[in-house]
Amino acid sequence: MASSRVDTINLRIWLVSIICAALSFINVTVHLIAINFPNLGFPCAYFEINDLKAVNLSANNEIYQMTHQLYINPVQIICYVLIMAILFLLIIIYYIVCCAKVFSSNKTSNVNQTTRDITWMGDTSSCFQFILIMDTFQLFVTALSFRLVALGAFAYSIFFVCFTTFNVTLITQFQSADKSFFAFQKIHPNLKGTVQFKTVVINLSELMLGYSTMFLGITTCLGVGNSIYIRSITVAFSSINTFLVMACIYSIVIEAVLVRYVKPLFGYYVGMFCGAVGLSFPILQYETFFESEWSTGLIINLSVVAIISIGFIICRLVRYLVKKKRRYKQLLNAESSSLMDENE
């Protein structure tokens, strides 16, 4: 049976959105590579936003100087940008593979089956959300290169919102593995492999979302700390507490709602733990530089985040392994129900 007109239109729009996402990925990749080299139009190295070794407090105490707050070190920033670029590449490959599989199996006897497959894999809206993620991430890195920390914090906030929306869209369009295997074995056996692929993509994306939650806290507080007069230690505590509150909210939403769609959803908790561990190294450097008596409190707050993340990992693992058995009761017929009514 030939594809319906609705399937044809949706398939063409989906193909155009994937092409746009691929072009955006090429643009962002070239930008992220070029920004690492001097004399290419970028004034500063984006990863040296908080170089504590080059600070001289006796000489750089003017009002127009950037205040050095708690932030991750250059190696961590470079690794974060690199891993995000790899994640972008993996998502592009996922969309291309899904598009190829749909084109190779679009002959079906079911009306609008292609539209349902596209919706399950990642429709046009998720593609454009992915484009917004890449563009806002590019803007964030560019703002760091120009030392515009307030603009960088604003750009990263938009990036984080788009990243969250993209993850929720992918997860909520996902059926359970049993239903997906059953549907694809009966209708489209060629699409069965996308179940595992999408699960991997979702967990890797959630892992980076968990780490980005930590990055959101320190980047937002870095922008606030350089926009208003506020103590550096207050900014440091605010960064960790923002990370803690946001991570707890996201973890509760995952366990309460999103696990109904994807059971093996461990990525966010692993990213949350990696964020807590990654932030511990800058705190030790922060203590050495400022000789702050508050470093113990910072470590305690960060340890709470790590413990909570481990607790959520154990909770998700237990809920994933323990299968609830439904007990089926025999339906009551008319006679038995009348006897029960008489007894009552």
Swiss-Prot record:
It is a multi-pass membrane protein. It is found in: Virion membrane; Host Golgi apparatus, Host trans-Golgi network; Host endosome membrane; Host nucleus inner membrane. Keywords: Disulfide bond, Glycoprotein, Host endosome, Host Golgi apparatus, Host membrane, Host nucleus, Membrane, Transmembrane, Transmembrane helix, Viral envelope protein, Virion. Residues 1-12, 98-125, 169-203, 260-263, 315-344 are intravirion. The chain crosses the membrane at residues 13-33, 77-97, 126-146, 148-168, 204-224, 239-259, 264-284, 294-314. GO terms for cellular component: host cell endosome membrane; host cell Golgi apparatus; host cell nuclear inner membrane; membrane; viral envelope; virion membrane. Residues 34-76, 147, 225-238, 285-293 are virion surface. Interacts (via N-terminus) with gN (via N-terminus). The gM-gN heterodimer forms the gCII complex. Belongs to the herpesviridae glycoprotein M family. Envelope glycoprotein important for virion assembly and egress. Plays a role in the correct incorporation of gH-gL into virion membrane. Directs the glycoprotein N (gN) to the host trans-Golgi network. This is Envelope glycoprotein M. It comes from Human herpesvirus 6B (strain Z29).
